[in-house]
Amino acid sequence: MSETTETQNTAGLKLNGLFAFKEGMATIYNENGEAVPVTVLRYEPWFVSQIKTNEADGYEAIQVACHPKKAKNSNKAEKGHLEKAGFENGAQFVKELRQAAPEGTVVGAQISIDSLAKGDFVKITSKSKGKGFAGSVKRWGFAGGPASHGSKFHRRPGSSGNRTWPGRVMPGKKFPGHLGAETVTVKNVEVVQIIAEENVLMVKGPVPGARNTLVKLVRE
């Protein structure tokens, strides 16, 4: 690894977390020769776009942005807000990390991949795979009805009614509907490896979502 490449990827602002994109799963081997299943995450340059404070915003956070937009896809307000961060036409992703800004933090600073280190345990938040419309058996794990002996009740939800009161189906009742595509959080996930020169992070086990899903990692 050249000195220039190392500086480019590791220099920058270190926060208590970062955002990355899911690539897929792989298997690596640790020092004891044991196979470890990992999810490979692709890190791309994120820049500070706003510093939020208790006085001005009511809470402390660092807003970060990534992926420049095309001019035709952005509006004037977006351009004005993100121009100082280096995004003339806005950004595809604008997210926040809830923490106080480290000393010396300025708008436009790049977030370092070294915000996390090997051995850290993180809380991961991402969007699960969408599976379309699903019945109550697949979506909620309903047992279903008899499979044979003349039964005509197999995978239907069954009765959803109540009594004279309330005389309606209560909100939140488990019914068929859209499965997946929900925000999912997984805690205590170990960072197995960070390859700064390739902008790659590896975390132990699976991570919710399809390939290229945006993943938020926050140190616990």
Curated annotation (Swiss-Prot):
GO molecular function annotation: rRNA binding; structural constituent of ribosome
Superkingdom of origin organism: Bacteria
GO cellular component, one term: cytosolic large ribosomal subunit
Keyword annotations: Ribonucleoprotein, Ribosomal protein, RNA-binding, rRNA-binding
Similarity remark: Belongs to the universal ribosomal protein uL3 family.
Main function: One of the primary rRNA binding proteins, it binds directly near the 3'-end of the 23S rRNA, where it nucleates assembly of the 50S subunit.
PANTHER family tied to this protein: 50S RIBOSOMAL PROTEIN L3, LARGE RIBOSOMAL SUBUNIT PROTEIN UL3C
UniProt cross-references to HAMAP family, sorted A to Z: Ribosomal_uL3_B
NCBIfam families, per the entry: L3_bact (TIGR03625)
Self-association and partners: Part of the 50S ribosomal subunit. Forms a cluster with proteins L14 and L19.
Name recorded for this polypeptide: Large ribosomal subunit protein uL3
Organism the protein comes from: Bdellovibrio bacteriovorus (strain ATCC 15356 / DSM 50701 / NCIMB 9529 / HD100)
Designated gene of the protein: rplC
